[in-house]
Amino acid sequence: QDIANSGWNYTSSSSYITLSFWVKSSVSQDFKGYIRTVDGTSQVYPYSTGTLSANTWTKVTKTIPGNSNLQFDNNNNTGFQLYLWPYIGTSYTDAGVTENAWTAYASGTRTPVSATTWWTTNDATFEITGVQLEVGSHSTDFEFRSYGQELALCQRYFCKMKAYAGASNGWIIQYPVTMRAAPSATVNSGTIGSVNQITTSTSNWNLSGGSANMAECFYSAEL
């Protein structure tokens, strides 16, 4: 998810993102989590689910403000990490940690002290679904998509094709869907002879030249 260009004015305390998810535990407990930013001076935002009723699906919604210390570089590296722990142990917690507020990240002060009920209960279960992160101060219903819809959206960024061969002509290889941008093409296995030209667009990949065979090729248009 592109945080830097999402529309969230993340350095302003009056601009928000909203995290929502459904969670169920076989034991009643308050579970801890945190958000961590990576770029610049790392920041942490601890939160909790509140005490869950055993074996009951509960929707958790967290509205998170921006902060002047946040930084998200405009690249494809990791910049935003989201955690929710059934049990985080004792090495990363501290009784003095304040929830629902940004502060400088430190390994030993990620969340307040976590209850041990779930951890010490044999065969305890923990389930989570419908995780959604949105710009704004309100959550919306989770958007369910069919497998075909989700696959087509993913293929805008990456696809893989196999088994093409030729003599001394050329290929025009059509992608399954129009890609986000002209991708980079990488031949993973096979051989290419005297190549005259390789061109890519958002809709196809064109190779012209001498004899060639391709067992597998990756096309990537990642952010």
Where on the chain are the PLM-derived regions?
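Extracellular and organelle-lumenal recognition/adhesion modules and their flexible linkers in secreted
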Residues: 1-223
